[in-house]
Structures are given as structure tokens and as C-alpha cells.
Amino acid sequence: MAFSKQFPETTRRSFLKGAGAVSAAAVTGAAVGGFPIPAIAQAQEVTMISAENNGAALDALKAIAAGFTKESGVNVVINNMDHEAHKTAIRNYLVAGAPDVCSWFSGNRMRAFVKRGLFDDISDLFEKEKYKDVLGATAGAVTEDGKQYGLPTGGTLWGMFYRKDVFEQHGLTVPKTAEDFMAYGDKCKAAGITPIAIGTKELWPAAGWFDQMNLRINGLDKHMALMNGEMSYLDPSLTDVFDQWEAMIGKGFFTPNHTSFGWQEAAALLAQKKAGMMNLGAFLRSAFTEADLPQLAYATFPVLDAKVGHFEEFSVNSIHIPAKAKNKQGARDFLAYFYRPENLAAYLEPGGNVPPRHDLPPSKDPLVNVAVETMKTVQGTSQYYDRDSDPDMAQAGLVGFQEFMAKPDRRKAVLTRLEGTRKRIYKI
């Protein structure tokens, strides 16, 4: 028997998904991550805390849970949280009141909890289900010291999104080089539309723009050296990045007053034909009506240095078993069921996520299939500034990049401050 309960949802922004509902088979008894669960038959349950704010994807997750219950007789309790609130809550519930399964991020975000002994090693599940055979290089996103601590779920390929009809109306072409981009921006300005929609109220979109430029000017190795605290924010190799970025700001290529816009509000400008392009993930589709979605197209960020290889920003979400989970075997059984190709595909489809398994059927979403094809030519990937960096360094960087975009004359002060933060965090 399943129960349903609505939990208050915070009003903070959703990162990768649109708004959704909350489901739980929880009424009374012990607490998991701050949520009550039944005192009776807890051993026959698998508890999960998710951060799924896309309503259709959450419905798919509920359906998968129901299918698992029907097949195994084990009930799945899903407590869904706001995406942003979950980033704080997980730091508490992994220590006390852990669920059996939780959603999170792969890469450095995962490793921070692995180093603290808060995620369970599920290498046995990988071996049993032969996941390495179907994941290929993506398995590395959840691997630390040769062991696997989660399953990669959906990936987001970041890039330049635009409306095909807007490009046709104004005679615009997708910029392939730095020169193309500047010409594109000038043409947009002449047509009365903003070249690049961006909202930096939530900080991270500015860091995403930095990532794209740094990857294309300095390459992946130097970019990751900066992310890992091994390179100075005053390094001369970053001069060209900020010179070109400052030139774009000076020409008025970005949304005016962007610090007052959230990413969803900025995406609405793209949907409303008030901007030409936007650097984001396919989740910006939530700003478009169903009728307008066929107009949405993807392009890679322009090449800024032809000598630099093809690197992209590709962030991967993941699902984990906390080290303090009470029903670890039940959690493994549920993950194996959830990760079946047909189930994972049903979960990923609503959000336009790129599948981590190569044995899933083609998506109904052409943007996803374009992303899959793009990834075949990529020489390496980063995840995203705030996923690749130390959390404290990331927060300082997010604030700094927004400040630079709003007040480019503060560039030297911003970079000097970031360098001081780097030295403090990495004890240099």
C-alpha cells in the first residue's frame, strides 16, 4: 500500500529541472533526512531522497518505484526535495538519518563525500551488472581510486542554444570562430536583439561562460589545473580569456542588468525572440511552449583558438547509496532495477538528459540526439566550474565572475581576490 504526502517546497531556483511534486510513502515513525517514515516494516522498504523538480521525470521515477515494488514486494519511499535545498540538506542527512538511496552529482562533488566515508562502495553492483561494458568512459565520473560509488544518471551537454526562426528572420548564422562571434553580436545589436541571453542572479551562468572560454583558449589540462587549485588566477594564460570576455561585455553582447535575472527569466528572453543565443543546457526548454520547441536548436561554443582541441562542458548527475543506509541490499536491488535500459530511458526522457549508457534507444528529443552525436567527437570534458572546483573556491569564483561581468573595471581586484582564496584553501 502506498501513501502520498506533500512536503513544502522552497522557492529557490531549480538547476536542471522545472517545477515538480513530492511523493512519499511516509506517515509516522522514524525520520530519514528529516522526513518521517513508517515504523512498521521498515526492513521491507527502500527509502530514497531525490531532488527531481521536473514533474514528468518525477512521475517516471514514481512509476519505476511502483514497478520495483510489484516485482520485488519491497516498497520504495520517495521523498523529493527542491534541487537547491537538497544541496544543503545532503550534508546533514548523510551524517545522521541517511536514506537508502539519494541523488547527487558525480565527479568532485561525489568525491568530497567519498573522502569523508559517506557514500557506499558499489563496485560489487558494477561487476554483477557489467555496467562498465555499457558506460564506457562515463564510469569514470563515479569512480575514485578504482572503485565505484554511484551510478551516472543523466548528462547535460552545455552549449549555445538558439531559435531557428529568429536566425532566419534576421539573417544570422551560427558563429564558428571568435571573429564570427563578434560579427554575429554586431548583427544582433543592429537588429535590436541581445546577442546573448544570460541571467547571473544565481551566479553560476557567469562561471559557465568562463568555462567555455577557458576550455577553448587554454584547453582542458590547464582548465582542470585551475579547477584543482594547481594554477594561479593571475596566470598570464588567463589574460586572453578575460580580454576577449571584456570586449564582449564592452560591446553590450549580454543581457542588460543580468544580475537581476535568474536563468529561467533569461531563457524566457530567448523563447520570446528578444535574444539570439544562450549558453546553457537543454533544460532551458522549460522556457519554451510545446509549439515553439521545434524551433530550439543547439550549437557548440565557437572555436577561440584553432590549435586547441575539442573540449566540452558535460556535467553528469548520479545516484548513490549512503554509507549509513539501513537497507543496503534493498538499495542495490532497486538501483539495478532503476538502471535497466527501459527504466532509465523513461526517467531521462522528460528532462532532455543525455543517457550515460550506450545501449539506450534513441531519444524522441532531437536535441538529445544532437548531444549524443556531438559527444562522439569530443576529446575531453569538464563538468562545470562549481562541480569541478573545491566548494569554497567555487563559491568565491561564482561571486567573482558575476562581479566581473557587472563591473569589468574590477577585473584585477576580482582575480587578485580569487588568487588569495586559492592560496588559503590549498594552503599555498
What are these regions (language model features)?
Residues 1-14, 23-29, 37:
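N-terminal secretory signal peptides
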Residues 105-159, 182, 209-211, 237, ...:
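Hinge/lid segment of periplasmic solute-binding proteins
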Residues 149-153, 158, 182-230, 275:
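Extracytoplasmic/periplasmic solute-binding protein
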Residues 3, 70, 168, 377-428:
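Conserved C-terminal helix/tail region of periplasmic/extracytoplasmic solute-binding proteins
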Residues 63, 67-134, 143, 165-176, ...:
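Extracytoplasmic "Venus flytrap"/periplasmic binding protein-like
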Residues 51, 64, 111, 243-327:
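Extracytoplasmic/periplasmic substrate-binding proteins
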Residues 185-187, 227-258:
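Glycine-centered hinge/linker elements that transmit conformational signals in sensory
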Residues 140-141, 299, 348-396, 403, ...:
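Long, aromatic- and glycine/proline-rich binding clefts that accommodate carbohydrate-like moieties
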